[in-house]
Amino acid sequence: MSSTSSPTYTISKTLNTNYPLIDNDPHFRRVIGYARPSDYVHGTVAGAAGPGLLYLMEKMAPSGVGKGGFPKAMRLATAVGFFGGFLYFYQRSILRFYGMSENAREVQMDMREMVDKVKAGQPLYGVSTLPVDVQGMAARQSRYSALFFAVLPWFNFVNHNQHGVDTAKYYQQAERELEAERLGKGSSS
């Protein structure tokens, strides 16, 4: 009996959305890097809402907790607001990767980033030192995880190649661009 094993991949389901899927398990850095200025604004407003409302309520109807009570409540509200604002910011950005909100800008950014990596001969989704089976486990655990953010915030920090998209489009676009560059250089000489 042979004890060799081949890597097993679980084909991920693709959700039916109005916009194209970019990546169903984007790396944390990509989600932050592709965020729009409006995501930062929404996250900041959501984060400031907690301490802002607590301050407003204290001014409108003082709680009378005594010296030192209100600052502790404000520190807690600020910490909760900071994490809540960050999660809202992150979720707005990652939902565009899933194709659940308008993502034309991100589709172009993704195509440019991946085609540049193909041209440079780099792996599309980074290099990982983890074994393939551990990469697969990480992919299965964090795929579409932002849909469950309200219960359990879960991020992808692992480089792997299981992202639910056909990567052939990147290689085909790189070939077209390289051919256009070659023809452009040939006609100019």
UniProtKB/Swiss-Prot annotation:
Posttranslational mods: The N-terminus is blocked.
GO cellular component: mitochondrial inner membrane; respiratory chain complex I
Membrane-spanning segments: 73-88
EC number from the UniProt entry: 7.1.1.2
Membrane-related topology note: Single-pass membrane protein
Function summary: Transfer of electrons from NADH to the respiratory chain. The immediate electron acceptor for the enzyme is believed to be ubiquinone.
Subunit composition and interactions: Complex I is composed of about 40 different subunits.
PANTHER family given in the database record: NADH-UBIQUINONE OXIDOREDUCTASE 21KDA SUBUNIT N-TERMINAL DOMAIN-CONTAINING PROTEIN, OXIDOREDUCTASE 21 KDA SUBUNIT, PUTATIVE (AFU_ORTHOLOGUE AFUA_4G04750)-RELATED
Protein name: NADH-ubiquinone oxidoreductase 20.9 kDa subunit
Protein source organism: Neurospora crassa (strain ATCC 24698 / 74-OR23-1A / CBS 708.71 / DSM 1257 / FGSC 987)
